[in-house]
C-alpha cells in the first residue's frame, strides 16, 4: 500500500500586519506633532500635548486609515492577486498625501511618530510593488528607488519650487501674479543683475584661460614639476570662504603692501581701487581657476597623440597643429570649464561680501534681503528665482548640448603615438604666466598665514598669538571652539550619509534599468547647478512652515550639507562602478545572494577608494560651505564659516584669517591622511597580487 505525500508551501505571515503595528507603536511612544524646542529642551506639558493620543485630533485618522489594509487574509497574497497589491500601494500613497495635506491645513508640523509612519507606509508600497514583480521583484532595489525618489522630492524638488511661491504673493499673503515685477522693475535691481552676469562671464573667461595654461604645463611641458597641478587642485578645496578675499585685501587693500608700494613708487592716489569689479574678479579667478584646471587637465590627457603626429606627418607646423588639432579637440572641455565657472561665480557669496564695495551682485543682495534690517522675502525670492533659472539654463546647455557631442579620440587601435612638442613661443609664454601665477599665489597664502600672526595688518606687523588666543584660548565653551566642534560633528555626520546616498543612487542608475532613470540622475545633479545662496533661501521657504518645520535645527544644516554634495558621491560611484564588470553582480545574484548582500560583499570592497575619496571630499566641502548654510544656522547650531563671516562683518580680519589658517591646516592634514590610507590599501592589494 503506497501513500502519496503532497508538499504544501509554508504560508508566511503577511508583513503588512507588522508594518501597520509599527505605526501604532510609534503613535503610542513618540510625539505625532513637532516640538518647538526639540525633545530634550521642551517641558513635560509641551511633550504631552505633542502626542497624538493626548487629545482627539486629526492624527488619530492618520493611523486608522492604514489600518484598513488589515482587512485581508492573515497570510501573504500571491502574485496573481495583482488587484490587491495595486490597492496596497495606492492606499499607502493616499495615506501619505492625506497626512501632508491635513497637517498643512492644521498649520502644525509633523513629529517623530509620523516619520516612523511614513517609513512603514513606504515599506508597504515596497512590498506591494515587489509582489507585482516590478524591477524583477527585488525588494532592496524597489525600496532603494522609493527612498531615493522620496528624498529627491522632499529636499531637492520641493525647495526649488518653494522659492517661486513668494514671487506671486503680496504683503498680505494674497495671490498676486505680477508681484515680482515690482522688484524687477527697479533700476538698482536691473543693475545688480547686469553686474552679476558681466562678472560671471569675465570670471569664466579668466579662469578658463589660466586653467588652460596650468593644464598645458602639467600635461605637455612639466616633467618633475607636475606636482604643481596637484597642489593647485587641493588648495581651493580646503581654503575656507572669505580667506582668498581677505588675502587679496591684505596684499592690495587700502593698507596692503602692494598698494603702499604703488603709492610710493607710482604716485597712486586711489587706494580703494581694489574694491568693486576688479577685486571680485581677481579673487574669484584665484579661487575658481583650479576647478577649470582639473577639467582641462583630464581632457588633455585623453587626447590621442597619434592625431597630432598625423598632423606633423602632413607637414603642418607646430602652431598649425596646435590651432587646428589640439584646440578644436578641447572645445567641449573649454566650454564645460567656462560654464561651470560661470555658475560658481554667480553663486559666490563670500568674495563679493569682502571686496564688493559699491558693486552689488545677486548673491550678496539676496543675503541682505534675508538678514538685513528689513526682511523682504518677495525680493529675495525674485532674485533667487532669477539666479536659479539662469544657472539652470547654463547647466542644461552643459548637460544636454555639450554632453551629447562626440569628440572621441581614443579608439581600439593599439598604436598610440608620441606626444609632439608644442611651439617654443607657446612653451615660454606658458612658463612665464605660470611663474607669475605661482608667485602671486605664494604671496597670497603667505600673506594669509603671516597676517594671522600680526597685531594689526598695515599698522603694526609685530608677531603675536593674540588672534589665536581669542579664538581658542577662552575655554571650550567660548571663542571658536563651539563652532569648530559643531562643524566637525555636522560634517562627520553628513559625509558618510553623502557617500552612501550618492553610491546608492549611482548603483541604481548604472546597474538597474527602469523608466525615469535619466530624470533621477539629472535631478540629483541639479544640486551642482543650484547656487548656494538660492539653496539656503529655498530651504528657509520650504521648511519654515507646516507640515515640516526644520529651520533652526541641526538637522536642516546636515541635510543641506548632504544635498549640496551628493552629486560628488554619485559621480564617484558612477566612475567606480564603470570599472567593475557587471558579470560580478550577475554571478553573485545567480548564487542566490540578494542585491544588498551583493553590494556589501562584492561592490563595496572594490569601491573602497572611490568611497573614501567621496567621503573626504564631502567632509571638506561640508566644513567650507557658507552660502547655503549661512541662512540656516542659529546661535545653537554654529559652524566655522558662519563664525568667520561674523568676524568679517565686525571688521576683525586678523581673527577671521587666523581661523581660516587653522581650517586650511586641519583639512590638509585630513586629506593627506586619507590619501596615505588609500595609497596603502592600493599598495597592499598590489603586493598580494604579485605574491599570488
Name each region found by the language model:
Residues 175-185, 463-475:
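A short amphipathic helical element positioned immediately N-terminal to and/or at the very start
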Residues 1-22, 68-94, 118-147, 224-226, ...:
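Transmembrane alpha-helical segments of polytopic membrane transport and secretion proteins
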Residues 250, 349-374, 456-461, 626-653, ...:
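Glycine-rich helix-loop "coupling/hinge" segments at transmembrane-helix boundaries
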Residues 207, 314-316, 591-593:
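A short glycine-centered flexible hinge/capping loop motif at secondary-structure junctions
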Residues 14-40, 57-63, 88-115, 142-171, ...:
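Membrane-water interface segments at the C-terminal ends of transmembrane alpha-helices
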Residues 311-312, 588:
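The alpha-helix within a helix-turn-helix
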Residues 317, 406-421, 457-471:
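Juxtamembrane inter-helical linkers in multi-pass membrane proteins
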Residues 67-78, 340-392:
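Hydrophobic alpha-helical segments
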Amino acid at each position: 500500500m503506497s501513500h502519496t505525500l503532497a508538499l504544501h508551501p509554508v504560508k508566511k505571515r503577511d508583513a503588512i500586519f507588522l508594518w501597520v503595528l509599527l505605526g501604532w507603536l510609534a503613535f503610542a511612544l513618540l510625539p505625532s506633532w513637532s516640538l518647538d524646542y526639540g525633545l530634550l529642551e521642551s517641558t513635560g506639558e509641551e511633550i504631552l500635548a505633542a502626542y497624538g493620543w493626548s487629545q482627539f485630533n486629526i492624527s488619530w485618522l492618520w493611523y486608522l486609515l492604514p489600518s484598513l489594509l488589515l482587512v485581508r487574509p492573515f497570510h501573504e497574497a500571491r502574485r496573481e492577486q495583482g488587484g490587491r497589491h495595486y490597492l496596497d500601494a495606492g492606499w499607502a500613497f493616499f495615506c501619505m498625501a492625506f497626512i501632508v495635506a491635513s497637517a498643512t491645513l492644521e498649520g502644525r508640523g509633523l513629529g517623530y511618530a509620523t516619520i516612523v509612519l511614513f517609513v512603514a507606509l513606504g515599506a508597504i508600497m515596497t512590498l506591494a510593488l515587489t509582489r507585482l514583480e516590478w524591477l524583477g521583484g527585488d525588494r532592496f532595489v524597489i525600496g532603494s528607488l522609493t527612498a531615493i525618489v522620496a528624498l529627491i522630492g522632499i529636499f531637492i524638488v520641493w525647495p526649488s519650487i518653494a522659492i517661486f511661491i513668494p514671487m506671486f504673493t503680496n504683503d498680505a499673503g494674497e495671490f498676486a501674479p505680477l508681484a515680482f515685477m515690482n522688484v524687477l522693475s527697479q533700476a538698482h535691481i536691473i543693475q545688480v543683475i547686469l553686474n552679476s552676469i558681466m562678472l560671471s562671464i569675465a570670471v569664466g573667461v579668466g579662469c578658463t584661460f589660466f586653467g588652460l595654461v596650468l593644464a598645458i604645463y602639467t600635461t605637455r611641458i612639466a616633467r618633475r614639476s607636475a606636482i604643481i597641478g596637484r597642489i593647485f587642485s587641493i588648495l581651493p578645496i580646503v581654503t575656507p570662504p572669505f580667506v582668498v578675499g581677505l588675502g587679496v585685501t591684505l596684499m592690495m587693500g587700502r593698507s596692503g603692501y602692494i598698494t603702499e608700494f604703488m603709492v610710493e613708487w607710482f604716485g597712486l592716489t586711489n587706494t580703494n581701487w581694489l574694491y568693486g569689479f576688479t577685486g571680485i574678479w581677481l579673487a574669484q579667478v584665484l579661487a575658481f581657476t583650479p576647478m577649470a584646471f582639473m577639467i582641462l587637465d583630464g581632457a588633455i590627457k585623453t587626447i590621442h597623440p597619434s592625431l597630432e603626429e598625423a598632423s606633423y606627418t602632413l607637414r603642418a607646423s607646430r602652431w598649425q597643429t596646435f590651432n587646428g588639432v589640439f584646440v578644436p579637440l578641447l572645445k567641449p572641455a573649454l566650454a564645460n570649464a567656462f560654464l561651470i565657472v560661470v555658475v560658481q561665480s554667480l553663486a559666490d557669496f563670500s568674495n563679493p561680501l569682502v571686496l564688493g564695495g559699491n558693486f552689488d551682485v545677486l548673491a550678496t543682495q539676496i543675503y541682505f534681503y534675508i538678514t538685513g534690517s528689513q526682511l523682504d522675502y518677495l525680493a529675495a525670492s525674485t532674485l533667487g528665482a532669477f539666479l536659479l533659472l539662469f544657472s539652470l539654463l547654463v547647466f542644461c546647455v552643459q548637460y544636454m548640448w555639450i554632453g551629447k557631442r562626440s569628440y572621441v579620440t581614443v579608439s581600439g587601435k593599439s598604436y598610440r603615438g608620441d606626444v609632439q612638442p608644442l611651439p617654443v613661443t607657446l612653451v615660454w609664454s606658458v612658463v612665464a604666466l605660470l611663474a607669475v601665477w605661482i608667485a602671486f599665489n605664494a604671496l597670497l597664502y603667505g600673506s594669509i598665514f603671516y597676517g594671522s600672526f600680526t597685531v594689526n595688518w598695515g599698522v603694526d606687523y609685530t608677531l603675536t598669538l593674540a588672534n589665536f588666543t581669542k579664538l581658542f584660548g577662552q575655554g571650550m565653551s567660548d571663542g571658536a571652539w563651539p563652532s569648530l566642534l559643531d562643524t566637525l560633528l555636522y560634517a562627520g555626520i553628513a559625509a558618510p550619509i553623502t557617500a552612501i546616498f550618492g553610491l546608492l543612487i549611482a548603483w541604481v542608475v548604472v546597474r538597474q534599468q527602469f523608466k525615469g532613470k535619466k530624470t533621477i540622475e539629472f535631478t540629483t545633479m541639479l544640486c551642482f547647478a543650484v547656487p548656494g545662496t538660492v539653496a539656503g533661501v529655498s530651504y528657509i521657504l520650504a521648511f519654515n512652515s507646516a507640515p515640516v518645520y526644520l529651520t533652526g535645527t541641526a538637522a536642516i544644516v546636515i541635510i543641506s550639507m548632504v544635498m549640496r554634495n551628493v552629486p560628488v558621491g554619485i559621480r564617484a560611484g558612477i566612475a567606480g562602478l564603470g570599472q567593475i564588470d557587471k558579470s560580478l553582480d550577475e554571478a553573485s545574484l545567480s548564487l542566490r545572494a540578494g542585491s544588498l548582500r551583493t553590494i556589501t560583499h562584492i561592490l563595496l570592497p572594490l569601491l573602497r577608494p572611490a568611497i573614501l575619496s567621496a567621503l573626504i571630499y564631502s567632509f571638506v566641502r561640508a566644513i567650507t560651505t557658507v552660502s547655503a548654510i549661512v541662512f540656516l544656522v542659529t546661535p545653537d547650531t554654529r559652524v566655522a564659516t558662519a563664525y568667520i563671516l561674523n568676524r568679517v562683518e565686525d571688521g576683525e580680519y586678523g581673527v577671521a584669517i587666523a581661523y581660516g589658517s587653522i581650517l586650511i591646516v586641519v583639512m590638509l592634514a585630513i586629506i593627506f591622511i586619507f590619501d596615505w590610507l588609500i595609497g596603502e590599501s592600493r599598495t597592499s592589494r598590489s603586493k598580494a597580487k604579485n605574491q599570488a
